[in-house]
Amino acid sequence: MKKVYLSLSLLSCLLFNGTLFAQDFYQEQRAGWLDIAEATKPTLIETIKKTIGIVSVVKDEKAYQGWKVFPKQPMDSLYTRSMKKQSGVVLDFGEHLTGFVTFKIEDLNRAADAALRLKFTFAEVPAEAALPFDPYHGQLSRAWLQDEIVTVSEVPNTITIPRRVAFRYLKIEVLGSSVYSDFKVSDISVKATTSVKEPAAPLAATTPDLIKKIDQIGLNTLKECMQTVYEDGPKRDRRLWIGDLYLESLANIYSFKNHD
């Protein structure tokens, strides 16, 4: 019995003391690991991408997740008219992108006499642009959902949203503006980033079209996950998980061959 009590006492000390669990066995090596990581961090390739047009998001039971997009208007119709009259407009970049959004704000007819507030919703699929994010009942952090509220106090101005986003469609809503003055937005672009330097070699000409499409989607996905590390996803979690690192590294060896 004494041995049992002694064992229980020792276990209690370990559990409630916490000293053993607080030790960092790799403390001396961590600084060196960070230096190596910084020295081998790849340079990101930046490409400016523009929107291809305004689209309508329409309910369609046969479409993926019940929503489909149709071309609506060219971008000039947004850039030359009042943004207040176009709140809720949805833009299509024509492809999935990962990067940083920049836009210009300008006065229309008279100088702004109040701050402007805009909401940007970044959607990977049409349903995200059509359906509201709130109320949110998911278990993951609400902050992972890609919507940003931007307040502009000075007009004219060029604004870059600091959050990196991954999306294809962009919805812009006007949350607040002066009743006396008007404004317009223009020159919306994305600075897309990736560490991929060269495109992958094309498949053989005899490859079936379906396989070519699957391969292209896979390459686009891999390219956007290849940032300063192999990310598990450019939207979420944006982390270097060991399983994703292994799979993405294998795919890179046989596609982009980006070994820097």
Regions found by a protein language model. Give the residues of each.
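Aromatic-lined, polymer-binding surfaces characteristic
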Residues: 238-245
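Bacterial Sec-dependent N-terminal signal peptides
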Residues: 1-23
